[in-house]
Amino acid sequence: HTTCRRQRQMCIRDSNYTDKIAYIVDNGKRKKISVNRKATFKSVKVAAAFHGWLSLDKQKKIPQILKLMQFPCSDALSYSHLAEGRVDVVIQCSNKIWDIHPLIPIIKAAGGYISTWDNRDAINAGSILVSSNKIIHNKFLKLLKPVSK
């Protein structure tokens, strides 16, 4: 069973429904992709967007995140960049189920961590945090805590 998303042909292969592999198809050849597992908080690359969902008053509660934002978040493309190891954290507000569901298996197969800002399962959508490793994920959950309610 194979599912491909977008023109970039980012895919996930599900072998026996247990061994999941995320890959891209480049010139007809499959290339396995994975998150940047070596990312540290000091070297983190962050893509984020609040799309008018987070008021300026709330944004003032997360100054450290605002300082770390280096890339705009553009939905599936940003999540794809995380799965390929190009960025380490993606933060987005108010995702709908159809925004995030197709990406969850790709992110997980690439080794990423995904949850809502209040550390619930992302399957129900909402404000989403995706990270390349557990340490960074937990750090950003703490930073987002003032606005996660």
For each predicted feature, which ranges?
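Single conserved hydrophobic/aromatic residue that forms the stacking wall/gate
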Residues: 1-12
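Short polybasic amphipathic segments
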Residues: 9, 20-26
